[in-house]
Amino acid sequence: MSEELPQRRETHPEELVRNVRERERDTWQWTSIRVPEEILQRWLAMLRSGRNRKKVYREMQKWMWIHPKGPVIRACGCRLCNPGWGT
């Protein structure tokens, strides 16, 4: 008896990009309503320049790992509802 390895489904580049964007969006939605005000304002300012998206994403992931049950402290994490450094 020989077992076959499971076949991996081929993914197209467009699908990979979509999955990354969805993961980033979900991470932002989870962390932006839970992080302290200072951290959120710093992230918004970093995202404004555009070059720091990966760095902010890594910091969000680290924050999620450290605070897996972080309480919701604001209703929305968008730039319009939280003006500050990034405006």
Swiss-Prot record:
A motif (Nuclear localization signal) lies at residues 48-55. It is found in: Virion; Host nucleus. GO terms for cellular component: host cell nucleus; virion component. The keyword Cell cycle applies. Keywords: Cell cycle, Host nucleus, Virion. Pfam families: Lentiviral_Tat. Transmembrane segments: none annotated. Seems to function as a Vpr-like protein, since it mediates host cell cycle arrest in G2 phase. Cell cycle arrest creates a favorable environment for maximizing viral expression and production. This is Probable Vpr-like protein. The gene is tat.
